[in-house]
């Protein structure tokens, strides 16, 4: 039997106490019922924001981990654009593929053919989590190919998922990857073969067309924006990957990613390391630059005893965060995966989104509400 044995529990079958342990309230509903204006600003106009949230309680019982999920409007059939959260699967799949190739490791130097930037796999993964670097992600997609990336996720139970394109790149949906020039040592290089992937088919989901208009280059098109060929990575899949990353032993062997201990330690370190710790300018890349829950609406330093292992995404007016939050001082840990649309004018690609005014403050306060609940929750 694994060290940790997963026990699947659904919120619907549980009697869960509120913060004061005096009622059977759903704690997520309790948080969303807050009178805080940062919460009310969204909850009072819920339909326009397409909110989906999964809050996961974590309990330890003898040698078992118990996950208890509480969902709000979570539905894999209701599409949202995952943006940079799709970099998380790319990072994990890259580590697993590296573990299968004897001549490569995290510190192997390489560059993409036609690109002047020489890097390492470790640097790409660090940049993905610290500042959500698009180019770093795209280099990993060239290494993997879309088909292999998706297969690796599905094989481990991370589903549904369909990563179809690179991010913020010309020909982002090109099905043929670019070769990588890899340094086998200081004087010897090898060139990988291009990978031909399966062309993406249009997604048949609700809310796949959004808004009332969009800009194509500099031209305003008076029609909903069509996301049917975009990446698809819903809340359920994001939660599944996060759980398998933080608590691999809670899953059967066939659902664990094949990472060695060095790789796993590196991944976890990358997920919680703050930008200034990697040498980024703290004025621009402050502690909570890509930590939306609890701290996203402040540029103040984050407390040392709270670590957030996460991946955010923001594009097309959609904010998403997938996070494991750990308070080592108070022995509290929990997970939140949430997404919100903030595009009040209904026009996409106009760069007029309410990220800072509505979206990030909502996610930050949601994190604070659930954190306060966790501090008082009986275990």
Question: In which residue ranges do the predicted regions lie?
Answer:
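Sec-dependent signal peptide recognition
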Residues: 2-10
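C-terminal motif of bacterial Sec signal peptides marking the signal peptidase cleavage site
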Residues: 17-18
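Structured C-terminal helix/loop/strand segments within mature extracytoplasmic catalytic/sensor domains
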Residues: 21-40, 223-235, 239-379
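Active-site-adjacent helix/loop patches that line small-molecule binding or acyl-intermediate pockets
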Residues: 24-36, 48-49, 116-255
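A short, well-structured edge-of-sheet supersecondary motif
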Residues: 36-74, 336-338
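Active-site SXXK
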Residues: 80-105, 336
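Residue-level preference for non-acidic, small/hydrophobic
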Residues: 87-94, 128, 153, 238, ...
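Short, well-structured active-site flanking segments
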Residues: 96-123
